């Protein structure tokens, strides 16, 4: 809806030209009467010069008013609309124009009178265009008068604060700041002087690093952008959006940190459990150092030392000594002591039948008991010989070598005694071969397996060459020798 407004007369043309016909004609002045004792002509000339200066100043003021008055008034009326960004397109164009004018004035090499000439030329062109557009038809004047008489009122309430309100609020805040600073100056002038000097020093340093043109342009930007942010609550909208994003980010970071804490606690629990299990295992299975074990094993075979059980589950042996156990008395020379102890029981009889040393080692035991003993000792003897032969090829320490050599010596002596006994009893077994032929075959087989002097093929060849008669004669002679030895040994039995 529209409301009538008081009509205002509008005249076309420049303000100076329009005001000229409306101004009343100056009243005619009567020629001044010369008072008595008129002033000299020099004073009249000075008064005329003063009037000319005043007229020239009035003309310059009229020209300046014509040149800048109407644009200034137009910009003043439109400033509220442009700076409040009610019409974004107009405000954007004004912002671009202000930037162009600023950088033109800042970068142009022209002098001041060149700039003034350009401003006057621009104003004349604007006035000509205005007269041509508004004075083309008569209806334009009528329409202009109606449009100025009636004003359109927007029924929608504008919730945004106006530019005048923003300016008023800013001016009020600035006035309050000045009042507080004046009170602060009265209460503590020294602190006020120090504060002012600090601010001036700050701006001096800032101006030495940043040119004044940049600072002026920043002021221009603030003049356009601060009302935009303040009147449209852009800062509040941006803050609300950023706050929502920050809340989401805070929640995400908090959840991530809590998850990492849970994972770290679980890892610590597993590590502690693993450490406990490792401690249990280490208690059950102690670790033995290789150097310590080698040092403990590097012992001599000369002296005997006591054995002590260490904490790590090994024997503690002093260097240069061998361990002593309950059964270590018979480990050095067991078979030699047994042989020397029983050697006195062997008969030392010379029967004049041409017997050799092997006949003297015969024990004269019954044939059946000796055969059973040979059958029982045949298998273990071969295994011990194989073990002793295999053990010689291994790298052994001194005590192990001593035990091995003692065992080997005992085995050799036992084998020699057994061989001698078998040789003496071979004749008796061959004499009984007719009653038990299988017994003679077993004896021949055992003799061949024990001594292994010839291969089986060589024995077969020798038997084929000599014949059975020679074998039978040798067996008869052997029976005579063995029977003579046994009769002398057993006596009246």
From Swiss-Prot:
This is Reticulophagy regulator 1. It comes from Bos taurus (Bovine). A motif (LIR motif) lies at residues 449-454. Endoplasmic reticulum (ER)-anchored autophagy regulator which mediates ER delivery into lysosomes through sequestration into autophagosomes. Promotes membrane remodeling and ER scission via its membrane bending capacity and targets the fragments into autophagosomes via interaction with ATG8 family proteins. Active under basal conditions. Required for collagen quality control in a LIR motif-dependent manner. Required for long-term survival of nociceptive and autonomic ganglion neurons. Residues 330-344, 368-388 have a biased composition (Basic and acidic residues). The lineage of its organism: Eukaryota, Metazoa, Chordata, Craniata, Vertebrata. Residues 77-87, 136-204 are lumenal. InterPro entries: RETR1_RHD (IPR055255), RETREG1/3 (IPR043384). Homooligomer; oligomerization is enhanced following endoplasmic reticulum stress and is mediated by the reticulon homology domain. Interacts with ATG8 family modifier proteins MAP1LC3A, MAP1LC3B, GABARAP, GABARAPL1 and GABARAPL2. The keyword Transmembrane applies. It is found in: Golgi apparatus, cis-Golgi network membrane; Endoplasmic reticulum membrane. Residues 315-326, 467-486 have a biased composition (Polar residues). The chain crosses the membrane at residues 56-76, 88-108, 115-135, 205-225. It is a multi-pass membrane protein.
